Curated annotation (Swiss-Prot):
Keywords for the protein's UniProt record, in alphabetical order: Aminoacyl-tRNA synthetase, ATP-binding, Cytoplasm, Ligase, Metal-binding, Nucleotide-binding, Protein biosynthesis, RNA-binding, tRNA-binding, Zinc
Region Catalytic, annotated ranges: 246-549
Cofactor note: Binds 1 zinc ion per subunit.
Keyword RNA-binding: yes
Catalytic activity: tRNA(Thr) + L-threonine + ATP = L-threonyl-tRNA(Thr) + AMP + diphosphate + H(+)
Organism ancestry: Bacteria, Pseudomonadati, Pseudomonadota, Alphaproteobacteria, Hyphomicrobiales
HAMAP family: Thr_tRNA_synth
Family indicated by similarity: Belongs to the class-II aminoacyl-tRNA synthetase family.
Tagged with keyword Metal-binding: yes
Binding site for Zn(2+): C343, H394, H526
Gene Ontology MF terms: ATP binding; metal ion binding; threonine-tRNA ligase activity; tRNA binding
Name of the featured protein: Threonine--tRNA ligase
Any GO BP annotation: threonyl-tRNA aminoacylation
Residue ranges occupied by any TGS domain in the UniProt entry: 1-64
Length: 658
């Protein structure tokens, strides 16, 4: 006798079904057209193969190809088809792993001769053939003995290693697509034909097996796939636009910074780049002052013992830089480390001197330079470096002050992003992971506060910010908010964080005296807005395509002469611009004015003031904006007034206009 289960549907209805019914049979019972469009089903939020039995009661939903959740399946299946195509064309190739990643997928292959870009065209053609065959995906559960034997006979030794690493309590799944098969956790769609043709192989790269430089080098083929051609075209167009906006190229053209092999992941800031960096710091320093933060500075180098207390030496050591004094190089009496994070130093500052509940909240902020070892292959311009500056802050407060502090941080973060033109923001609350410190009661309390804060934010900023909850994604020491912004070409960047910490104050014995004269452990909030200031500057350069807002631009104005007869006049104008706080230089070179304009435009100078004999006689200038072929004739007074207003940072504009 079959067991009956109760299923809840998205429309709120509930029905009973046999437990052994499959997802496909469920779809067919609803409608034949739904079954034809179905690619998988979801039970209590977990995506499953349509061939899987339902097995239990729960919230069920049929996933069709138009569903956003189908995109991961399309890409996953595409990775399998890529592997089959490679082995059809190059039979000696071993397949290893092929996961879905952001915006696409990849597959790593082991062969003596690495693939080239020319090979991708051939492989892609073969993939389209395989998709056209429309072979069904079929799942089998194998014993470990059978799996080891079959893959060993195929000389798929990387797969054998993977099989040996799978825990005994997990099923060993094999997915067929026609005659070809692969080891895989699944799930998959019904057939290769459901993938469609909206895919493209993107590039070839090297990758170490399991990311370990001691292991063999493999060839990685990257690809992308979408549900339809329009989405694929939009993505490829975005990539073209991103290449034009690449901050590394613009950094060279604008003479902002450079890197060199003696300091991998370390930035050499040039004058203009450093000016932009300082503009960012000055902006944030004013915002922090308005929100009653105390700016501090903790040492760059600290003894290992402190990092052992904080826990970093145990769980973050491989990402840290050791520092051993040269005089002690042999006996290693002291081992120091360059700080990878600012938080332990801020706890020491909080502990210096007795604190009362009346002193709280205490908000400590630092533009702290931190060092983290990143693999050389992951370094990427300003976006991924080994030495960077965090706009870090740590708030020490009472439990009763926690919600208000989180809301205040939220307001500061959102207004900051708005000042830089970012209007599409998403906020995610990450809750307790499996491995964590602190009691369940402590987590229950903290999460209830954070969820309450999230609801308040949703109400206050209705329609302006997208919110979601990510179960199990919090840090081991507390739940957190993550802020993600969308740039001018639709890319998302995770920047701001608000992170509760139950761990560090306890480790260092931080306390304050409460109203009953008892010692109490403060609540500690980690908070960042830009995150890495270097990375945020890279995001800004790409978002604005180098055409920075006047207040942030490293070189705001160039006064360029048409003739030497206007040289003295141009110098006087430049002096007047500087006198009102504008960044201006004079170009008196004996070059044609079009040459000067073209050169300064390449360097992304926002405003060029053109001066000739006529302008000198009429006390005027011709203003030319970056990206515009037009010039506007203005009096010097009007030009200075206009540019002074534009160059005022947005936070100061609010004060002026209040």
């Amino acid at each position: 006798m079959s067991c009956s289960i109760s299923l809840s549907f998205p429309d709120g209805s509930k029905r009973n079904y046999p437990a052994e019914m499959t997802g496909l049979e469920l779809a067919e019972s609803i409608s034949k057209s739904l079954a034809k469009k179905a690619v998988a089903y979801s039970l209590d939020g977990i995506t499953r193969d349509l061939s899987d039995s339902l097995g239990q009661s729960g919230q069920v939903e049929i996933i069709t190809r138009e569903d956003s959740r189908a995109l991961e399946l399309i890409r996953h299946d595409c990775a399998h088809v890529l592997a089959e195509a490679v082995q059809e064309l190059f039979p000696e190739t071993q397949v290893t792993i092929g996961p879905v990643i952001e915006n696409g997928f990849y597959y790593d292959f082991a062969r003596q001769q690495p693939f080239t870009l020319d090979d991708l065209t051939i492989i892609e053609k073969k993939m389209r053939e395989i998709i056209q065959r429309n072979k069904p995906f079929r799942k089998e559960i194998w014993s470990r003995e059978k799996a080891r034997r079959v893959f060993s006979e195929k000389k798929e030794f990387y797969k054998v290693e993977l099989i040996n690493s799978i825990p005994d309590n997990q099923d060993l799944k094999i997915y067929y697509q026609g005659e070809w098969f692969d080891l895989c956790r699944g799930p998959h769609m019904q057939s290769t034909g459901q993938i469609g043709n909206a895919f493209k192989l993107m590039k070839v790269a090297g990758a170490y097996w399991r990311g370990d430089a001691n292991n063999p080098m493999l060839t990685r083929i990257y690809g992308t796939a979408f549900a339809n051609e329009n989405d694929l075209k939009a993505y490829l167009h975005m990539l073209e636009e991103a290449e034009k906006r690449d901050h590394r190229r613009l950094g060279r053209e604008m003479d902002l910074f450079h890197f060199q092999e003696e300091g991998p992941g370390m930035i050499f800031w040039h004058q203009k780049g450093w000016k932009m960096f300082q503009n960012l710091i000055n902006y944030m320093r004013r915002r922090l002052d308005d929100h009653q933060y105390a700016e501090v500075n903790a040492p760059q180098v600290l003894d290992r013992s402190l990092w052992e207390i904080s826990g970093h030496w145990g769980w973050y050591k491989e990402n840290m830089f050791k520092a051993i004094p040269a005089a002690e190089d042999l006996d290693h009496e002291h081992i120091y480390a360059l700080k990878p994070m600012n938080c332990p130093g801020h706890v020491q500052i909080f502990k210096h001197g007795l604190k009362s509940y009346r002193d709280l909240p205490i908000r400590l902020a630092e533009f702290g330079l931190v060092h983290r070892y990143e693999p050389s292959g992951s370094l990427h311009g300003l976006m991924r470096v080994r030495s960077f500056t965090q706009d870090d802050a740590h708030i020490f407060c009472t439990d009763e002050q926690l919600a208000a502090e989180c809301l205040s941080i939220n307001d500061l973060i959102l207004s900051t992003y708005a000042d830089f033109g970012f209007k599409e923001i998403s906020l995610k609350l990450s809750t307790r992971p499996e491995k964590r410190v602190g009691s369940d009661a402590l987590w229950d309390h903290a999460e209830s506060i954070m969820e309450s804060v999230l609801k308040t934010i949703e109400t206050k900023f209705a329609g302006q910010i997208k919110t979601s909850i990510l179960p199990g994604e919090g840090a081991f020491y507390g739940p957190k908010f993550e802020y993600t912004l969308k740039d001018a070409i639709g890319r998302e960047w995770q920047c701001g964080t608000t992170q509760l910490d139950f761990n560090l104050p306890e480790r260092f014995g931080a306390f304050y005296i409460d109203k009953d004269s008892e010692k109490r452990q403060p609540v500690m909030i980690h908070r960042a807005i830009f995150g890495s200031m270097e990375r945020f500057l890279g995001i800004l350069i790409e978002n604005f395509a180098g055409h920075m807002p006047l207040w942030l631009a490293p070189e705001q104005i160039v006064v360029a002469t048409i003739t030497s007869e206007a040289n003295e006049y141009a110098q006087k104008i430049t002096a007047r611009l500087k006198a009102v706080g504008l960044s201006a230089t004079t170009d008196l070179r004996n070059e044609k004015i079009n040459y000067k304009i073209r050169e300064h435009s390449l360097q992304k100078v926002p405003v060029i003031l053109v001066c000739g004999k006529r302008e000198a006689e009429t006390n005027s200038v011709n203003m030319r904006r970056l990206g515009s072929p037009n010039q506007t004739l203005l009096s010097v007074e009007d030009a200075i007034k206009q540019l002074s207003n534009e160059s005022t940072p947005p936070d100061l504009q609010r004060v002026i206009n209040a």
